[in-house]
Amino acid sequence: MPPNLTGYWRFVSQDNMDNYLRALDLNVALRKLVXLLKFDKEIVHEGNHMTIRTLXTXRNYXI
C-alpha cells in the first residue's frame, strides 16, 4: 500500500527551472511560458485508490 499523501500540495518555487529547460534544449519562448505556470496538486486516498488532480491556471487534470 502506498504512503498516504492526502492533501493539497501548493507549488512553491522554480529554482533553476530555466537552466533545466535550457539543458533539455527548449526554445526561449517555451521556457518563458513554462516559467509562468504554477501547478498545484490535490491528492485523495480512498482505500486502495488514489486520485491526483493537477490544478493550473489554464487547465486542470485528474489521474
UniProtKB/Swiss-Prot annotation:
Q: Name one GO molecular function term.
A: retinol binding
Gene3D superfamilies per UniProt: 2.40.128.20
Establish whether keyword Protease is in the entry: no
Q: Which UniProt keywords apply?
A: Retinol-binding, Transport, Vitamin A
- Where is the signal peptide, in residue numbers? none
The UniProt family comment states:
Belongs to the calycin superfamily. Fatty-acid binding protein (FABP) family.
What is the documented function of this protein? Binds vitamin A2 in the eye lens and thus functions as a UV filter. Intracellular transport of retinol.
Q: What is known of its domains?
A: Forms a beta-barrel structure that accommodates hydrophobic ligands in its interior.
State the protein's name. Iota-crystallin
**Organism listed in the record:** Gonatodes vittatus
The gene name reads CRBPI
